[in-house]
Amino acid sequence: MMTLVAALAKYEGAFAYHPGDSAALNAEILALMRSGLKTGTCDAWVIYVDGTEELPVVGRVDIALDWAGRAALATRTLAVERIAFDEMDEMRVAQQGEFRDLAHWRLGYEAYLTRAGRFAPDVDMMFERFEIVEDFGQ
């Protein structure tokens, strides 16, 4: 497994991020990414405006971390969209991998955004499509 320092040196300009908001969800998401079932993700747009997170940049390679902070995957951003929560569709939900359908996505993301104090039916979301560039191992 590559250290985070080595991964960031290899992919200059990369941003390191933790998929998910718990250890269990992080492990599930990394497994879905590795399997190829997860090629998209989203979050509230405001976290990129307020500096909580770094907005993905098309073409940039970023480093997905496991819950312990170790480099797990290098991902390349293919597309970034701004879309309202209530305009999310089945196509984008399917790319996220962890949801059965749009209704399941809405339940999951409403709970997640509510926990973070960011939910509104029309909240702007960032939707990213990505590909795996390198798997640093489990």
Residue ranges, per PLM feature:
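Mixed-charge, low-complexity intrinsically disordered regions
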Residues: 1-74, 80-138
